[in-house]
Amino acid sequence: MDQNFSLMAQSRANYYTAGSPVQFVRVELLKGDTTGEVAVCLTFKNVGTEPLTGLVVHFKCKDAAGQVLCEDDFYYEQLNAQPGAVFGSDDAVYVSDTPVSSVEVEQDRAFLNGRGVDLRNYKRVRLNMPRVLPGSIAKTLQQRTGNVQLTCVPQDTEY
């Protein structure tokens, strides 16, 4: 059965992993239009200098009460993510008929030109919270771009 998914929620990563060739960028929760199922999609960026051919991540999805709905590994295989490329947002790592409230992500291993790189020892560095734009500026920006989600001061996302 074909079904379309629409964006329910999107959250950027609140940290980066200093020195890692791969950065976690955001998590998106999408809702199926016919079944109501929630798909969890993760987005990553190759910030290294070599093509990324694979990535293994560990994720944990929780409900509003903090109960674990799913904990598993996901394998992004046969990638050809060149330096600077963003990937993963079109792969659902988990589909649930129960609402998902939070997702925790840990990067495990990257494959750069087939060579495995352990990502578990890279330290997380917390990012500053986005600053909210004054209402009039946000409204003007939204009108000019046609994007109502533009409510915060743009941040440098180059790591």
Model-predicted segments: where are they?
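Low-complexity, acidic Ser/Thr/Pro/Gly-rich terminal tails and inter-domain linkers that flank the onset
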Residues: 1-43, 47, 121-158
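Intrinsic disorder/low-complexity detector
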Residues: 4-6, 48, 65, 74, ...
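Short, solvent-exposed, Trp/other aromatic-anchored flexible loops in extracytoplasmic proteins
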Residues: 64, 68-137
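Conserved aromatic beta-strand anchor motif in extracellular beta-sandwich/beta-rich domains
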Residues: 59-63
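Short acidic/proline- and small/hydrophobic-mixed sequence motifs that coincide with surface turns
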Residues: 50-54, 69
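Hydrophobic beta-strand segments
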Residues: 56-57, 74
